[in-house]
């Protein structure tokens, strides 16, 4: 586990909570870990974009630094409120809301299991 990125996930979870979305920072961390290939992607390095987030123009969103991304991502999760994000109580609910909202189109079980394998490595 990367403590720096886990702290950022906590920032995102807190920002989401300010907007009525309650998610475990472990879920966010796991999502970012999967999306960045273990925090090694070029997009992460060049755009501080841990989630593969696109702008409305269809290009990758650029963030000045990782804390800016973490703040944005917490607010971004509110876009999935109607897809079930407002009522998540488990990792599966979180993944299902993202899938329903179109965040990813891969098989839901595959994505869920990828995140679960990361969550299970977090020692607390």
Annotate each language-model stretch with its function.
Residues 1-124:
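Catalytic cores of secreted/periplasmic lytic hydrolases that degrade extracellular macromolecules
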